[in-house]
């Protein structure tokens, strides 16, 4: 019995991969997995429990205890709606810091693969194309310049009423890019066979259409 098809979309922080992936899933009637949210959920849960971000072993043991669910673009952790709580910049930074631990990445692999259900799945996030779903029917690496990504993140935060400085966001993204590209476990890279989509000058609709055309 063949497994349901997977479209895997990867890329650097704030490249728009989440927005594009969720819209592609909606258009195709597929399930959607925001794997980056899983790391943010671990970041939030570990912060609440006072676990040191450097303690990979304890963080890895925490993962199987978490009850995680996605419902109508809302994200729940142990029954609590944490959709907004995990999008706070401090949680994003914490998630990036704890993602370097192999214990966490291996603990999350099985959880991510469990989202592969009929009629199909669009998965976005780090190493979805290279590690989690290497047999994905379509692999896309979504990218944009750091300046373009910082500008988008700035607009998102301001629209939500969250104060932010463009210079700080740009510096944060550049630091995160460097950390994500150089880490020993699952560094940020273009997976074998992936199509690269440069979105600096594309609208969301144009990016979605391109992915659908490739599929």
Curated annotation (Swiss-Prot):
Pfam families on file: Cytidylate_kin (PF02224)
EC number: 2.7.4.25
Protein residues bound to ATP: 11-19
Leader peptide range in chain numbering: none
Annotated catalysed reactions: CMP + ATP = CDP + ADP; dCMP + ATP = dCDP + ADP
GO MF entries: ATP binding; CMP kinase activity; dCMP kinase activity
GO terms (BP aspect): pyrimidine nucleotide metabolic process
Cellular localisation: Cytoplasm
One CC-aspect GO term: cytoplasm
Keywords annotated in UniProt: ATP-binding, Cytoplasm, Kinase, Nucleotide-binding, Transferase
Broad enzyme group: transferase
Record carries keyword Chloroplast: no
Entries under HAMAP family matching the protein: Cytidyl_kinase_type1
Family: Belongs to the cytidylate kinase family. Type 1 subfamily.
Name of the protein described by the UniProt record: Cytidylate kinase
Source organism: Polynucleobacter necessarius subsp. necessarius (strain STIR1)
């Amino acid at each position: 019995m063949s497994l349901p098809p997977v479209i895997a979309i990867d890329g650097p922080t704030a490249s728009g991969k989440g927005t594009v992936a969720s819209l592609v899933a909606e258009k195709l009637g597929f399930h959607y997995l925001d794997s980056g949210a899983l790391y943010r959920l671990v970041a939030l849960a570990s912060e609440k429990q006072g676990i040191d971000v450097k303690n990979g072993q304890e963080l890895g043991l925490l993962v199987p205890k978490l009850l995680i669910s996605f419902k109508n673009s809302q994200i729940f952790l142990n029954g609590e709606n944490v959709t907004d709580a995990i999008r706070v910049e401090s949680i994003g930074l914490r998630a990036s810091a704890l993602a370097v631990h192999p214990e966490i990445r291996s603990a999350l692999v099985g959880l991510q693969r469990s989202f592969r259900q009929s009629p199909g799945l669009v998965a976005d996030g780090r190493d979805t194309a290279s590690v989690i779903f290497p047999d994905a029917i379509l692999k896309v690496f979504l990218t944009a310049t750091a300046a373009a990504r910082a500008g988008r993140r700035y607009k998102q935060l301001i629209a939500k009423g969250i104060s932010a400085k463009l210079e700080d966001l740009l510096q944060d993204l550049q630091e995160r890019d460097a950390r994500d590209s150089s880490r020993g476990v699952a560094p940020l890279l273009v997976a074998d066979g992936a199509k690269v989509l440069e979105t600096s000058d594309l609208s969301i609709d144009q990016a979605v259409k391109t992915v659908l055309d490739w599929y």
